[in-house]
Amino acid sequence: MLDNIHNLHKEATDKILSTSSLEELENIRSAYFGKSGFITVYLRNISTIKNLEERKSVGNVVNTIYSELKSLINSHRTKLHQIQIDNQLLQDKVDISLPIRPQKIGKLHPISNVLNEVKRIFLSLGFKLYDGPELEDEFHVFDALNTNKNHPAREENDTFYLKTLVNNKRVVLRTHTSSVQIRTMENNDGIYPIKVIAPGKVYRNDWDATHSPMFHQIEGLYIDKNINMGHLKYCINYFLNKFFGKNVQIRFRNSYFPFTEPSAEVDIKCNQNDWIEILGCGMVHSNVLTNVNIDPNQYSGFAFGIGIERITMLKYNISDLRKFYTNNLQWLDHYGFHFTHLTI
């Protein structure tokens, strides 16, 4: 096994040093350190080695190789990035004899515009805006939301954890703004209804054309007596018709989330036969209500979560999520909005 690991180390090192583009380097990183990457698989399999000494030996070697390759990727990324900047500077030489162009007014980023639009729609339904910390403890992100200890979302390959503990608890970059809902219910003091939306940044360990390690989400929560699935469907239908237009076709599909029961995913029809998932929702699980000292025999409610980048891409026909964060002024000029859209 150690021979295979050392061969893998040499192979990865050669590939990293020989690559000449950031895109190739990212593909190599994913191949070795992604969810199903070679190094990731070895790390997972260490616990299956029965011999204690062999497990320690293999564990030390794999962890050392893990650190070395991570460091090598980071240093090579810095080098390639500098080369890219140098090449760009050579291409972007400015003719100083040209006359000065009039100053342009900047545009509102499409994410900011859509966030404002979504807030306006839900505020018109009587929801209130709430905010919460992006650094959270595991209770508010996972435990209170009925997410068990072995759930895949809690793995370090999917979630960003801090190395240091706070009050002997692990701290995580929140994976959803549901943590704001938990804090809102905790601090409710028996005042109903609870009708809130929680927009904000969330973090997950993923990076490709449709996923980003940081993205924006808005979650909604409505708790009161006698709230049912009909209230949820009305709310979602109202939002989607306002956001995408009155002719949008909508369907609800059965799904599973640990924090809602029943749960549903909502799709809209894009072409003649194509349905695209828009959001997840459901009736708040009784365990979640119990965890925040709300009696599920008296109160019920619904919750939903919407990915802002996702609905922005669909509404404005943007194919690559990564373009939102490249600071490309030409792209922003094309997809951005005039500052008069900045209202709520």
Curated annotation (Swiss-Prot):
Mg(2+) binds at residue 261. GO terms for biological process: phenylalanyl-tRNA aminoacylation. It is found in: Cytoplasm. PROSITE patterns: AA_TRNA_LIGASE_II (PS50862). Its cofactor is Mg(2+). It catalyses: tRNA(Phe) + L-phenylalanine + ATP = L-phenylalanyl-tRNA(Phe) + AMP + diphosphate + H(+). Coiled coil: none annotated. Binds 2 magnesium ions per tetramer. It comes from the Bacteria. The keyword Aminoacyl-tRNA synthetase applies. Keywords: Aminoacyl-tRNA synthetase, ATP-binding, Cytoplasm, Ligase, Magnesium, Metal-binding, Nucleotide-binding, Protein biosynthesis. Its EC number is 6.1.1.20. The keyword Nucleotide-binding applies. Its main location: cytoplasm. GO terms for molecular function: ATP binding; magnesium ion binding; phenylalanine-tRNA ligase activity; tRNA binding. GO terms for cellular component: cytoplasm. It holds the Pfam family Phe_tRNA-synt_N. PANTHER family: PHENYLALANINE--TRNA LIGASE, MITOCHONDRIAL, PHENYLALANYL-TRNA SYNTHETASE. Belongs to the class-II aminoacyl-tRNA synthetase family. Phe-tRNA synthetase alpha subunit type 1 subfamily. Tetramer of two alpha and two beta subunits. This is Phenylalanine--tRNA ligase alpha subunit. It comes from Ehrlichia ruminantium (strain Gardel).
